Swiss-Prot record:
Pfam families assigned to the protein according to its UniProt record, in alphabetical order: PDEase_I (PF00233)
PDEase domain location: 586-930
Ranges annotated as spanning the membrane: 260-280, 297-317, 328-348, 366-386, 402-422, 433-453
Pathway linked to the protein: Purine metabolism; 3',5'-cyclic GMP degradation; GMP from 3',5'-cyclic GMP: step 1/1
Lineage summary: Eukaryota, Sar, Alveolata, Apicomplexa, Aconoidasida
GO biological process: cAMP-mediated signaling; cGMP catabolic process
KO phenotype (gene knockout): Knockouts at the asexual blood stage are viable and have normal merozoite formation in the host erythrocytes. cGMP hydrolysis is reduced by about 20% with no effect on cAMP hydrolysis.
Name the record gives this protein: cGMP-specific 3',5'-cyclic phosphodiesterase alpha
Active site: H680 (proton donor)
Localization (cell): Membrane
Cellular component, GO annotation: membrane
Positions bound to 3',5'-cyclic GMP: H680, T681, S682, L683, H684, D721, D832, Q884
Cofactor note: Binds 1 Zn(2+) ion per subunit. Binds 2 divalent metal cations per subunit: site 1 preferentially binds zinc, while site 2 has a preference for magnesium. Tightly binds zinc.
Membrane topology of the entry: Multi-pass membrane protein
């Protein structure tokens, strides 16, 4: 009885709490509410208070729901049967929505004016039902023209003086149009027409309706867009902006592999018909030689294998680049047409030597049979080209070239026929030859006309969606305030990544995004109040409810990695150095860089003086700081000392009593802290410093910031890994190292690097800030610590999210101190992983170094009986490739995309993002490479415990 009362009290309260709290996102097992709380552990505790019961229930539900969710995920990912079923479902879905879902455009109404809304409501829905319209909704055009000719003339003449043709209401015309056709159709069928008359009647209906549909649709589309949208597209429907073209193809034609799959299925069916009709009904009666049979079978097998390869090609190779699939598809299509023509040529050539000239009747029949053979091959090629244009609808330029190529080969068939059969044709009576040849020309030109019509249909279809794409992107650019000469697409799209849909977001960012959607929906309602008013109001309510739920989150600035399953694994491996972790650790909110008591007037005057003078020095070093420059060749001596002196001296010398000898001593001292380990060496620090300076030039910030800020950035980059032992934070925490105990397991190594730096600066022999004002030094110290701590990968997505929430409100020509150092943190983080942007050989070299360092840590973990980290046992190329693909896609590209948002001249995309994408492709090619990296043999007798002595802890 007691249990029942407790249940009745708790269950309604728990339902309310669950609706208000969204902290647990996994599926819940609702069956648990049917159980009374009679668990032994609960009863023994003798605590029947409401809160303890609620906690027990919540814990129980979380455990069971997590197990259920993990089991479902395991089945979906690892079960081959489920994979097969999912694949079949996906293709069935594509088949049902081939014409509308394949070219889905998000938020079309958001970017269209009233004219464009007409297109969305009519043309796009018509596109979905085009097949039904052609078969079921024709309006009896042909009959209407005959029966109601006088009536139409009278009505038009009576209104000619009062109305312009363009001002006539379309709905009235359409209603009259359908009425006339329905009346005539009833009269027509009363007279019991013959089958031939009925066939011609249906054919003319379809042809006229098809013609009206295409040309009316083209006229509406051309009248709906202004000239500015069309100017961005050339005559062959290619964007003048190269980035637009690539983004458009990868975004709106992602279903191309399936359409190729469907086209190949149709063609396999047509191949069977082609072979049966051609050989068993024609060639077998003409030729008795076995060579013809073998040749026909060989051609049939070639066609089957050809089309079957494009069914298996997208399924098994799993290529993610559409341009590779389309290129191979169209190149092979040319080969297919050439092989078909070659087959026809061989058959004709054989016929010229196998037919006797003394039998006129036999020769006459043979010429007609050759003509029929030629016509079948022409139809076969035309059907192949027609289906390719009409079904795939990929690129008008590609299909236009291929269609012209097919038409040229059709005329080659004519030449082939007249050249090889000329001596037979001249002996034929004109009366016997003329009519068959006329039929031959009619059917061949009919199919050529179908190719041209399919090409025109594709042109209209693709032009509409390209213009909508331009319209959408132009309006997105207008909404970005205080941004001049910025290409918004470069900031948001890459070949492998779309930031708006992929990167994990923080709750505060979700709130801002919901508010943006609310404002956009309000704008839609203001522009067109009568269009989907109820739906738009429901959207606003839903977004407000989402904001209300998000505001109940404990820390709205923390990125909820656990909500993104594909990011959770990568985050745990690369950012937390762990394979399994359910929830990210809570982080304290970052505080302001500058103290409120700081004398900003004196600071700004000091900074501006440095900025004006330092610009003179910086102009001499623009060429040296190329992003892809080889620093080992540029600085042939001690690279770290050379690049450090080159970066710091022109900025530090602006201070009156700056001591360059003390700067050299400081650099030598910091360099001595770097250990002889594979990756985190002084060369890595020099590379990061070079990257940070180069990034300032690419972002055009070198003349907008003070010299003291740049001075601190370069010190941060040179010292960000000083004293690194070649072990990560996870190892130091698990081994309870003194460093982890000192810094309370919080950014252990990063705090250690800061500590070494400022302990060095405390020594008068190395204090390069000795003559700086004290409040300037305090500010510099805070900024340097902030920058070095940002290199902890645990907070990687938090830094990206913080910038994303504020980037649209930043005036990049007049940056505040906080904004400068927010960008500097991103620059230092990007420079720290900058080896991902190098060309393949250099990138591979640095990757092997970091993997070697991880491997050594794994050996040390085994010797100390510590749980082995995930990245510390990679000894083959395929495992390394898998880890690097995730690292480059999910960690590197999002960060460089944010920097590309600031860049005005596309340099970040060219020098950073494109090389990363190229490196991803190279790693993709090594996914099946089982090459041994040789680390086990190299470190078989390594003294691993000596690595612990590398930590210079005092």
């Amino acid at each position: 009885m007691m249990d029942t009362k407790v249940d009745q009290t708790i269950q309604p309260k728990f339902y309310v709490d669950k609706k208000l709290s969204k902290s647990f996102d996994n599926k819940l097992d609702e069956d648990i509410f049917n159980y009374p709380f009679k668990k032994e552990s609960f009863l023994k505790s003798e605590k029947f208070s409401f809160e303890h019961t609620k906690d027990s229930l919540w814990k129980c539900i979380k455990e069971k729901a997590k197990k259920k969710s993990d089991m479902e995920y395991f089945n979906c990912v690892n079960n081959l049967c489920c994979k097969f079923i999912c694949t079949i479902r996906k293709y069935v879905k594509y088949f049902l929505y081939l014409k509308d879902s394949s070219y889905e455009i998000y938020n079309i109404n958001l970017y269209n004016n009233n004219n464009m809304n007409i297109i969305n409501n009519k043309n796009i829905t018509n596109n979905k039902n085009i097949t039904n319209n052609i078969n079921n909704s024709f309006s009896n055009d042909y009959i209407n023209y005959n029966h109601n000719y006088n009536h139409l003339n009278n009505s038009s003449s009576s209104k000619h003086n009062n109305y312009n043709v363009n001002n006539i209401d379309e709905k009235n015309i359409k209603n009259d149009y359908n009425t006339y056709h329905n009346i005539y159709e009833q009269i027509f069928f009363k007279y019991n027409p013959s089958f031939y008359e009925y066939l011609m009647f249906t054919l003319m209906k379809k042809l006229i309706h098809y013609k009206n549909y295409i040309f009316n649709k083209t006229k509406k589309i051309n009248n709906s867009y202004n000239n500015n949208d069309i100017k961005n597209i050339d005559g062959f429907l290619i964007f003048q902006n190269i980035n637009f073209e690539e983004i458009f193809l990868n975004t709106f034609y992602s279903s191309f592999p399936f359409k190729l799959f469907l086209h190949s299925l149709y063609m396999i069916f047509i191949c069977f018909i082609y072979f049966v009709v051609l050989y068993f009904m024609l060639l077998k009666k003409i030729y008795t030689h076995p060579f013809i049979f073998h040749l026909s079978v060989l051609k049939f097998l070639f066609d089957i294998i050809f089309f079957l390869s494009f069914i298996l090609y997208p399924l098994f190779l799993r290529l993610k680049r559409i341009d590779k699939i389309i290129y191979s598809s169209y190149i092979s299509s040319y080969i297919f047409v050439c092989v078909t023509f070659l087959y026809s040529f061989i058959i004709f050539k054989c016929s010229s030597y196998s037919v006797k000239m003394n039998s006129n009747t036999y020769q006459n029949n043979f010429v007609f049979q050759n003509m029929l053979f030629l016509l079948i091959n022409i139809i076969y090629i035309c059907i192949f080209c027609f289906l390719k244009n009409y079904m795939i609808l990929y690129s008008f330029l590609y299909n236009c070239r291929f269609s012209i190529f097919c038409i040229l080969f059709i005329f080659l068939y004519y030449y082939l026929f007249f050249s090889l059969d000329f001596y037979r044709i001249i002996h034929l009576p004109l009366d016997n030859f003329f009519f068959p040849f006329l039929c031959f020309l009619f059917f061949s030109f009919l199919f050529i006309f179908k190719i041209i019509m399919s090409l025109y249909y594709e042109y209209v279809y693709e032009k509409k969606y390209r213009i909508l794409f331009v319209k959408k992107n132009n309006l997105i650019e207008k909404r970005i305030t205080k941004r001049k000469n910025t290409n918004i697409n470069n900031a948001y799209f890459t070949k492998y990544f779309s930031i708006d849909n992929t990167i994990p977001t923080s709750p505060i960012e979700d709130i801002l995004n919901n508010f943006k959607h609310i404002l956009e929906t309000i704008n839609i309602i203001e522009e067109n109040p009568n269009h989907n008013l109820t739906t738009n109001i429901m959207k606003i309510k839903e977004k407000i409810k989402n904001c209300d739920n998000i505001l109940r989150t404990k820390n709205i600035n923390q990125v909820q990695i656990g909500k993104y399953r594909k990011f959770e694994k990568v985050y745990n491996i690369w950012c937390l150095d762990k394979m399994y972790l359910n929830y990210p650790l809570n982080q304290e909110e970052t505080k302001s860089f500058l103290s409120n008591s700081l004398n900003r007037i004196s600071f700004n005057s000091f900074s501006n003086m440095h900025s004006l003078l330092s610009s003179k020095f910086q102009e001499h070093y623009n060429d040296i700081y190329d992003w892809n420059g080889n620093i080992e060749n540029i600085y042939k001596a001690n690279t770290f000392i050379s690049i450090g002196y080159k970066l710091l001296y022109p900025l530090g010398v602006l201070e009156a009593n700056f001591d360059k000898e003390k700067l050299k001593k400081f650099l030598f001292r910091i360099c001595s802290y770097y250990n002889d380990i594979p990756y985190h060496t002084s060369l890595h620090a020099a590379q990061v410093a070079h990257f940070s300076k180069s990034m300032l030039f690419m972002l055009d910030m070198n003349h907008k910031i003070s010299a003291i800020d740049e001075f601190c950035l370069h010190i941060s980059s040179l010292c960000h890994d000083t004293g690194h032992p070649g072990l990560n934070n996870y190892f130091l925490i698990n081994s309870e190292n003194n460093l982890a105990l000192t810094y309370n397991d919080n950014s252990v190594l990063e705090n250690y690097h800061c500590s070494l730096l400022f302990k060095t600066l405390k020594n008068p022999n190395y204090n390069i800030f000795e003559h700086y004002p004290y409040h300037i030094f305090i500010s510099c110290k805070k900024n340097i610590i902030k920058a070095i701590l940002s290199t902890d990968m645990k907070n990687h997505f938090e830094y990206i999210s913080d910038f994303r929430t504020s980037k649209e409100f930043i005036d990049y020509d007049n940056l505040s101190n906080d904004q400068i150092w927010q960008i500097f943190c991103l620059i230092l983080k990007a420079s720290d992983i900058g080896h991902s942007t190098l060309e393949w050989n250099k990138h591979l070299e640095w990757t092997l170094k970091i993997n070697e360092e991880f491997y050594l840590q794994g050996l040390l973990e085994k010797s100390l009986n510590i749980q082995n980290s995930f990245l510390c046992d990679i000894n083959t190329m395929n495992k390394l490739a898998l880890s690097q693909i995730d690292f480059l896609k999910h960690l590197c590209i999002p960060l460089f995309n944010e920097l590309n948002y600031i860049c005005k001249n596309n340099d970040v995309y060219t020098h950073c993002i494109q090389p990363i994408e190229n490196n991803i492709e190279r790693w993709e090619s090594h996914k099946n490479d089982n090459q041994n990296l040789g680390l086990h043999e190299k470190y078989k007798e390594e003294n691993l415990l000596s690595k612990l002595e590398l930590i210079k802890f005092e």
